[in-house]
C-alpha cells in the first residue's frame, strides 16, 4: 500500500517519509530516519495514513519501532485490512501507553489505497472499465469507419489512468481492429503491462503490441512461449 508518515513536535514537522517500494523500509522508519535530533521523538505526534504494521515480514514491525521512541500519540486515517495486521498494530500501541486517534481523513485514505483495500477485503484486483460511447448509446459505426468519440481531455485522462495501473487488458478483436499501443503518451508515468485475451491465436503479427518494446502478455489456448518481453501463456 501507499503509506506516508509525518512526525510533528511542538507544532513543527521534524521528520517525514513514505514507503518507496515493495520490500523497502516503511514510511514510519523513513520518517524516523529523517529526524535530525532523535531526542525530539519522545512526546512527538506521528501522522500516518495507514495503521503501523505489527508483524515481522520483509521488515520489522513498525509499531515496535514507534513504541521504542515513546511518542505522545499516533494519528491514522485507516486501519490496515491485511488479516495479519487488522487492528493489532493499534492495539499494541495502546497497550504501551500511546494514544491512537483513528479515522482522520478516512475517506481520503481509502481513496489513496483503494486498490489495496479492494484486494484485502475481497481477494480481487481493483478494475477500471473504460469505454467511449455516443449520447445515444453507440460505440462505433457498423462498418468500422468511425474513429474518435472521446475528446482530447478524456483521452488525456485515459493516459493518466494507464500510468496509475500495473496492467491493461483487451480482447484480440480490439487489438486487431484498433491496433492500439496501450502505452502512456499524453501523461507522465510508467507504461502498464499490456494483456490480450487471444484464445485461438488470431493476433495480427504486425500489431503495435508486438512491434514495440513494451511488455505484452497474451493468454491463449495453444502455445506457451516467451520472446523477449512478449509472453504467451497457455490457459
Predicted features and spans:
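Short beta-strand scaffold segments in enzyme catalytic cores
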Residues: 2-11, 131-132
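Zn2+-dependent cytidine deaminase-like catalytic core
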Residues: 7, 12-108, 193
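A short, flexible N-terminal coil/short beta segment enriched in small residues
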Residues: 10-17, 108-121, 198, 203-205
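Proteins enriched for Cys/Gly/acidic motifs involved in redox and nucleic-acid/cofactor modification
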Residues: 23-24, 90, 104-132
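Alpha-helical scaffold segments in soluble metabolic enzymes
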Residues: 30, 34, 92, 111, ...
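Generic structural signal for helix capping and beta-alpha/helix-loop junctions
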Residues: 83-84, 110, 204, 225
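Short, conserved clusters of charged catalytic residues that mark active-site
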Residues: 85, 108-112, 153-156, 177
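Active-site ligand-binding patch in enzyme domains
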Residues: 118-119, 124-235
